[in-house]
């Protein structure tokens, strides 16, 4: 599909062909909405999990430019290999795109076979991934807390990304799932990215939450920062039953502290706020921190007497290969991708894969999850 990139075409022709090829293959043969630049942009996410840097995207762009104008095939193959890996990691049709490129450039299967492989594999995988995204499940977690009086049940929602591919009907689905639980819920937390992009989300989107009678605590994520945050928060506080915890602490039922920290890039500032809030209350109750971005290296958090950290943002790695990292290397890597982690027997970190995504509503072998957390106390 991208073999034309290896030729010395004029820039305008490359752009025209890129648009044409990706329009045909992405919109015509598949049922997801991806573009070349989206994949390049998302490529940084995988490496960002480990290095917290976007330099890897720059490397990919450099490789692409060199491959366009160099006669040495090693650069072409490096770019194609890089592109295949990135595409496979980050979009459901990425595997199909990568397979097509690999066949066309390296294996050189006949074009008609490539086309059939792409149609069957790409469309089939797309259907599976869209189905997965539209059928969220509960991820049940059970933990113990000796300092807690009685038991607690918490529902953890994250990364709804309303306003893009998700609307009121998505909220209705999540709310109905919660209401149909055969257990009493003490409170719900939403750990950021309630909205997606700069599309306005109105009160109507959030109205189904009013059916939930227990408290719903909410903090912002990085996508609220990208949009009309001030107006959205004002609407949340005035017209919905969501309780915004903007860098605040509430004592729930005189049994546990809930610390809400809105999204911030500066970890030092976040640490300072956590320490200030805990010291200010100083009631010796267990502390639950709700925060959007996972604490990638829990060692960076001093001993704040935390019991549990709830977060999202990573979408479970978004697709299948990343989930293997957790199972095979999760105890050696400090990176938190999905699920429950125990940090040095001091506190728990639960990273929920969430129910939405930014962009096409699809997930590659990573379930859309709502956290259901049972805490057993004394």
Task: Kindly give the residue locations of the regions a language model identified.
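Non-catalytic terminal accessory segments
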Residues: 1-136
């Amino acid at each position: 599909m991208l073999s034309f990139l290896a030729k010395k075409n004029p820039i305008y022709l490359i752009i025209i062909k890129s648009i044409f090829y990706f329009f045909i293959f992405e919109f015509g043969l598949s049922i997801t909405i991806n573009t070349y630049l989206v994949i390049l942009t998302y490529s940084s996410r995988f490496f960002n999990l480990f290095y917290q840097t976007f330099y890897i995207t720059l490397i990919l762009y450099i490789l692409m430019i060199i491959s366009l104008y160099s006669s040495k095939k090693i650069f072409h193959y490096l770019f194609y290999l890089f592109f295949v890996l990135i595409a496979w990691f980050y979009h459901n049709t990425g595997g199909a795109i990568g397979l097509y490129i690999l066949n066309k450039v390296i294996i050189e299967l006949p074009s008609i076979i490539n086309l059939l492989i792409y149609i069957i594999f790409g469309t089939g995988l797309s259907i599976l991934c869209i189905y997965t995204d539209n059928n969220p499940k509960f991820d049940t977690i059970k933990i113990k807390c000796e300092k807690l009086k009685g038991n607690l049940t918490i529902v953890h929602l994250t990364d709804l990304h309303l306003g893009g591919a998700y609307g009121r009907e998505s909220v209705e689905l999540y709310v109905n799932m919660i209401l149909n639980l055969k257990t009493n819920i003490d409170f719900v937390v939403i750990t950021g990215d309630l909205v997606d992009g700069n599309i306005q989300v109105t009160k109507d989107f959030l109205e189904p939450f009013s059916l939930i009678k227990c408290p719903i605590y909410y903090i912002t994520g990085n996508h609220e920062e990208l949009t009309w945050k001030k107006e959205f928060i004002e609407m949340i506080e005035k017209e919905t039953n969501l309780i915004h915890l903007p860098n605040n602490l509430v004592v729930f039922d005189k049994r546990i502290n809930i610390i809400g920290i809105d999204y911030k890039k500066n970890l030092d500032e976040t640490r300072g706020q956590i320490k200030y809030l805990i010291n200010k209350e100083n009631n010796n109750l267990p502390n639950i921190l709700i925060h959007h971005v996972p604490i990638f290296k829990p060692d960076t958090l001093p001993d704040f007497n935390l019991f549990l950290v709830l977060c999202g943002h990573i979408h479970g790695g978004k697709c299948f290969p990343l989930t293997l990292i957790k199972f095979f290397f999760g105890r050696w890597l400090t990176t938190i991708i999905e699920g429950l982690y125990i940090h040095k027997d001091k506190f728990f970190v639960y990273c929920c894969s969430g129910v939405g995504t930014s962009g096409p509503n699809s997930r590659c072998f990573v379930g859309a999850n709502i956290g259901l957390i049972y805490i057993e106390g004394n």
